[in-house]
Amino acid sequence: MKEELIRMILEEECIKFGHFILTSGKESSYYIDIKKLITNPKALRLIARLIKEKAEEEGIQFDKVAGPELGAVPIATALALETDRPLLIVRKKKKEHGTGRQIEGEVKEGDRVLLVEDVTTTGGSVLRAAKILKEAGAEITGIFVVVDREEGAKEAIEKEGFKLYPLVLVHELFEAAGVSSE
């Protein structure tokens, strides 16, 4: 199934070449546009199945599924449906109106949360979400990402005491596409 995901990423032309500024602030000669993939229902179902199966293989227990806005929300939603677990959405910042929440969905002390992300570079975005969830009382039992760019996210996430589970590493995408990652 991993090979099918790689094929879909390539078929949807999710790898863009040029000059890009990433969320991390880093400059890059390529961009992984996973949003093209996560708007495809077939791809979303596959991603949710892959995460569910990997979590089961690893013995990861979780009560809820969370994702930081925006890119991870469709992934978290698909996984919540696949696993029949409640969904949490972590906002980048607290709402300035209405309830003023930063987390949509109910978090209780001790909730075991599986956190998902679309792409990781340095891990900053998903670590911010993990911190917000922990402050609300959640225990992060695993962090899953569709594509890890292999630029330090794994190390940064592990340094904070979490484990990253990438479905695909960027070098695997480049190998399948027949291009150099340099």
UniProtKB/Swiss-Prot annotation:
Pfam family, one: Pribosyltran
Entry keyword Magnesium: yes
Binding site for 5-phospho-alpha-D-ribose 1-diphosphate: 91-92, 95, 97, 117-125
EC number(s) from the headed UniProt entry: 2.4.2.10
Gene Ontology molecular function: any one: orotate phosphoribosyltransferase activity
Annotated pathway: Pyrimidine metabolism; UMP biosynthesis via de novo pathway; UMP from orotate: step 1/2
Enzyme class: transferase
Cofactors: Mg(2+)
UniProt KW keywords: Glycosyltransferase, Magnesium, Pyrimidine biosynthesis, Transferase
InterPro entries xref list: OPRT (IPR023031), Or_phspho_trans_dom (IPR004467), PRibTrfase_dom (IPR000836), PRTase-like (IPR029057)
Gene3D superfamilies (alphabetical): 3.40.50.2020
Statement: the UniProt record of this protein carries the keyword rRNA-binding: no
Recorded family membership: Belongs to the purine/pyrimidine phosphoribosyltransferase family. PyrE subfamily.
Function: Catalyzes the transfer of a ribosyl phosphate group from 5-phosphoribose 1-diphosphate to orotate, leading to the formation of orotidine monophosphate (OMP).
Subunit structure: Homodimer.
Entries under PANTHER family matching the protein: OROTATE PHOSPHORIBOSYLTRANSFERASE, URIDINE 5'-MONOPHOSPHATE SYNTHASE
Name of the protein described by the UniProt record: Orotate phosphoribosyltransferase
